[in-house]
């Protein structure tokens, strides 16, 4: 099994890739700095040493974690590279052509992908954190899954 965590300012994204290729995605509000103990608690249902091949980390403060947890290798990924590689993979864009990858988290980052190099070229502080704040005020929830479920029921025609 492979595990990846993105420690965002507002949300921590967790992705498990099982040996059969099944992906399990989970989002949690970020309420503490990353630590080995926090990761062990997240995966208390697993024997990290026996069941997990490696753990990949990115996002804020990922560097607080060492190079292994319970003898499982930890890979640290620069967030700009993670956004660039992930954006190209998800979009299926031709990596030989320049592209701008946009990631909306607590803020919004614009990453230039060109010649195999990823560069932060622009961004704004408005992003997912703004959505969470508005959701708390208007919907009385900050649960990302509940917000997503409500958004899926909405009609985009009514937006500007």
Language-model regions: role of each:
Residues 30-40, 65-66, 83-88, 98, ...:
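Helical "lid/coupling" subdomains associated with nucleotide-phosphate turnover
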Residues 17, 111-114, 137:
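Short beta-strand-to-turn element immediately C-terminal to the catalytic PLP-Schiff-base lysine
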Residues 2-6, 52-56, 98-103, 123:
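Short glycine-aspartate micro-motif
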Residues 117-160:
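Glycine-rich phosphate-binding loop plus the immediately following alpha-helix
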């Amino acid at each position: 099994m492979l595990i990846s965590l993105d420690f965002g300012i507002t949300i921590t994204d967790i992705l498990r890739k099982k040996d059969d290729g099944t992906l399990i995605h989970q989002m949690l509000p970020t309420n503490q700095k990353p630590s080995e103990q926090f990761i062990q608690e997240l995966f208390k249902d697993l024997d990290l040493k026996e069941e997990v091949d490696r753990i990949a980390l990115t996002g804020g403060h990922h560097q607080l974690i060492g190079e292994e947890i319970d003898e499982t290798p930890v890979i640290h990924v620069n967030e700009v590279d993670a956004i660039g590689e992930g954006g190209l993979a998800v979009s299926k864009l031709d990596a030989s052509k320049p592209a701008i990858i946009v990631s909306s988290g607590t803020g919004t980052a614009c990453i230039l992908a060109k010649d195999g190099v990823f560069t932060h070229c622009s961004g704004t502080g408005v992003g997912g954190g703004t959505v969470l704040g508005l959701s708390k005020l208007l919907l009385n929830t900050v649960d990302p899954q509940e917000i997503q479920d409500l958004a899926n029921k909405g009609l985009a025609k009514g937006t500007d």
